Regions:
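A short acidic, Gly/Pro-enriched loop at the edge of an enzyme's catalytic core
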Residues: 100-109
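Class I SAM-dependent methyltransferase SAM/SAH-binding core
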Residues: 52-98
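Short alpha-helix
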Residues: 183-201, 207
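Conserved class I S-adenosyl-L-methionine
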Residues: 1-40, 42-51, 58, 143-170
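A C-terminal cap/extension of S-adenosyl-L-methionine-dependent methyltransferases
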Residues: 206-260
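A short glycine-rich, Lys/Arg-flanked "PGG" loop and its adjoining helix->strand segment in the class I
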Residues: 126-138
Length: 260
């Protein structure tokens, strides 16, 4: 995995985690994740692409044992400064090296939030899913939040800017996305692609849109000063979240896969 996000590490929380849009999208993920955790016997969790550790800390505070990994040493350093929870361990790990860093460990759940897996090629994603199966306990689960190809917000945004070449950019491979000054090669995957890649080892349990009405984070400057509009969009999002078919049109989607 080439993208390290070292440059983005220092400013990531300010540019996404603590923003209005970032908080709303994260709370949507937590609402679904909380239900998954309550319905299953979960003790040990592996997080992939943990970034600055926001989700790992939240999970650890729910009394789960969490191993949180990221390829970026600077992201891991930022995360480690946030907490000293005994049931949380941060490690620098390249996702493409799995399962080598965990030769004797099994996890009940593997979690990856907000498009970390979009830094993989389709081939790498398929290999990750195969490797993840070997790291999970019997009936273990993958909970992944991924960016799809057909995000309506993005298409409308580029249409409004008359940037017609970018309207369907998510359908291309290795799209260069700027993340806080760092150019990251990004690939987008619709739910059907993920379920197909995972079909040998997993069955789908849950599929939900994340950010169908709530916009992408790069629109934060526009929406930050319009709290009433954000409130309306949030209410609409709660309705949209009931309809899995909207997932490929949202900014992200949450997919839960259970090991066969």
């Amino acid at each position: 995995m080439n993208a390290s996000f070292d440059i983005a590490a220092a400013n990531y929380d300010n540019s996404f985690t603590h923003t209005v849009i970032g908080k709303l999208q994260r709370n949507l993920v937590y609402r679904h994740l909380r239900g998954i955790l309550e319905e299953n016997r979960i003790q040990n969790i592996l997080e992939i692409n943990c970034g600055t550790g926001e989700d790992a800390i939240w999970l650890a505070k729910q009394n789960y044992t969490v191993t949180a990994t990221d390829i970026s040493p600077l992201m891991v350093a930022v995360a480690e400064k946030k907490t000293n929870l005994e049931n949380l361990n941060f490690r620098q790990v390249d996702i493409n090296r799995l399962p080598q860093p965990f030769p004797d460990e099994k996890f009940d759940l593997i979690f990856s939030n907000f498009g970390g897996l979009n830094c993989l090629t389709k081939t790498e994603l398929g290999q990750f899913l195969k490797n993840a199966s070997g790291l999970l306990t019997q009936n273990g689960q993958l909970v992944l939040v991924i960016m799809p190809k057909n995000t309506l917000w993005e298409q409308l945004y580029f249409l409004a800017k008359a940037d017609f070449k970018s309207v369907f950019r998510r359908k291309k491979e290795n799209v260069v996305a700027n993340v806080d000054g760092e150019n990251i090669k990004t690939n987008y995957f619709n739910p059907k692609e993920v379920t197909h890649l995972a079909s040998a080892d997993f069955r789908i349990r849950l599929l939900k849109p994340i950010g169908f009405f709530i916009p992408p984070s790069y629109l934060e400057p526009f929406f930050r000063s319009r709290p009433k509009l954000v409130s309306v969009l949030h209410s609409l999002e709660n309705t949209a979240g009931k309809h899995s078919f909207l997932s490929k049109y949202a900014d992200h989607y949450l997919i839960t896969l259970q090991k066969k």
